[in-house]
């Protein structure tokens, strides 16, 4: 099981500099191992539905399509829910749902992360679930991957604990097969809820998922240059360290806010690229929050997972971006070569990394789970990052940093499996998928 499942992913953890021996132990010990690293296939596939024609391919129950969004039509039933983080009262909701076609991956997969973009007026919320064909030929149960609402007027957004069985479990936001088990298909269901008798409705504009079957390797070779050398995107730098102690009810404040800080940086970038399009919160939304960079505090409050007790739920972050008309989803990339294609297209990435203090030169810290923004590449192919940890210095000026390409690839690809948030306006096209590779965006 990959380090991506360590759910202290959004908290920095200093590592003693004497950990050199442990780092050395990760290095290849033979030519055979090095060859294995080069040849190991990284199976990743992503698929989404985001248009009227896409949604027509699925099965609707109590939902209808207006424009390119799903919404509740004539409800198919009702559901009673007691918010475990609310006042303890039970509310009854009208329900509609949409179920995707069955997706066959073509390989045995062991992890799946879903994505959705939805707007949820007060009194409404959505739930994502998945089922699939197990390696023994049986169909799995439905696993709940998240209950989402923009604010807390409806429910407190949350992952759902204690869903494990002999096939798989849900690790916060990720379906994870048990050791020695796998699945070969997946099928998503998004359920839409509104208070019974209300005429309001959530609207869902994107439903998708990434499934992966990855080799168990500890080190990868640096990937070939991908053509983005010398390109740097103007992503604004925000330091999570500035927010130490802010709103400790949200996972003890800014020290743990790497994910929403990174997401806020990408939203800030798109706001600068397209002024007036509303690709982020308005000043009135965060006017009462603690300065500076109050939009970071706002992002933290609005990505917070009440079960996980943290702001590092991956699809909650991309769903937050989706509130503002951006398209956001979670996938895995196979290499920095693939990441370069996004930079060439003008799209920064948020990526999940993990490393000991001496494994990423210039970071100045170690972490068992962290997120940062890839904003470009130097002429020689090293990574230009906006690292919200900012060398543990509470200063936005310390956020931009250049990291060695080979080192960066090895704290990203083998550790989180190459997790990336892809956030972009519909008007900015994604780059083409790599020819001959399974489509992972």
Tell me the role of every PLM-derived stretch:
Residues 110-112, 116, 126-128, 186-188, ...:
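Residue-level detector of short, conserved catalytic/binding motifs and their immediate flanks
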Residues 91, 100, 284-440:
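Conserved active-site-adjacent core of cysteine acyl-enzyme catalytic domains
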Residues 191-310, 438-441:
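Active-site-adjacent structural segments surrounding the nucleophilic cysteine of cysteine proteases
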Residues 1-34:
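Secretory targeting and sorting signals
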Residues 159-183, 341:
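Short, surface-exposed tryptophan/glycine-enriched loops
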Residues 107-120, 355:
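A short beta-strand element within beta-rich, extracytoplasmic domains
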Residues 38, 43-49, 53-87, 91, ...:
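Noncatalytic regulatory segments and standalone regulatory/sensor domains
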């Amino acid at each position: 099981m990959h380090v991506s499942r360590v759910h202290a992913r959004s908290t920095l953890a200093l590592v003693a500099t004497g950990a050199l021996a442990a780092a050395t132990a990760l290095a290849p010990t033979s030519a055979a191992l090095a060859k294995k690293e080069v040849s190991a296939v990284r199976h990743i596939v992503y698929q989404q539905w985001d248009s009227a024609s896409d949604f027509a391919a699925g099965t609707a129950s109590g939902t209808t399509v207006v424009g390119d969004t799903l919404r509740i039509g004539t409800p198919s039933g009702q559901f009673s829910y007691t918010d475990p983080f609310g006042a303890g009262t039970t509310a009854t909701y009208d329900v509609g749902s949409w179920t995707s076609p069955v997706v066959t991956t073509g390989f045995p997969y062991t992890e799946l992360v879903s994505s959705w973009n939805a707007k949820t007026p007060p009194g409404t919320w959505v739930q994502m679930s998945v089922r699939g064909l197990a390696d023994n030929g049986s169909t799995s149960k439905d696993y709940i991957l998240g209950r989402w609402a923009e604010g807390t007027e409806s429910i407190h957004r949350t992952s759902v604990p204690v869903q494990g069985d002999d096939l798989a479990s849900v690790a916060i936001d990720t379906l994870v097969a048990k050791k020695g088990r796998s699945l070969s298909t997946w099928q998503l269901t998004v359920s839409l809820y509104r208070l019974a008798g209300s005429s309001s409705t959530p609207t869902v504009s994107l439903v998708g998922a990434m499934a992966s079957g990855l080799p168990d390797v500890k080190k990868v070779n640096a990937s070939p240059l991908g053509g983005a050398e010398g390109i740097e995107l103007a992503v604004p730098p925000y330091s999570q360290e500035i927010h130490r102690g802010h709103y400790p009810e949200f996972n003890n404040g800014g020290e743990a806010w790497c994910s929403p800080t990174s997401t806020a940086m990408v939203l800030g970038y798109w706001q600068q690229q397209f002024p007036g399009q509303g690709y982020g919160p308005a000043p009135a939304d965060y006017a009462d929050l603690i300065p500076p960079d109050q939009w970071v505090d706002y992002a933290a409050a609005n990505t917070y997972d009440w079960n996980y007790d943290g702001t590092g739920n991956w699809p909650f972050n991309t769903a937050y971006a989706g509130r503002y008309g951006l398209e956001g989803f979670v996938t895995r990339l196979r290499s920095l070569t693939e990441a370069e294609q996004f930079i060439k297209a003008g799209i920064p990435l948020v990526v999940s990394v993990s490393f000991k203090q001496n494994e990423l030169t210039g970071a100045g810290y170690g972490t068992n789970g962290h997120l940062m923004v890839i904003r470009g590449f130097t002429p020689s192919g090293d990574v230009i990052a906006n690292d919200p940890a900012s060398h543990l210095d509470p200063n936005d000026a310390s956020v931009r940093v250049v990291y060695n390409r080979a080192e960066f690839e090895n704290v990203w690809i083998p550790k989180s499996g190459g997790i990336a948030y892809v956030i972009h306006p519909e008007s900015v096209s994604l780059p083409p998928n790599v020819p001959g590779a399974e489509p992972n965006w």
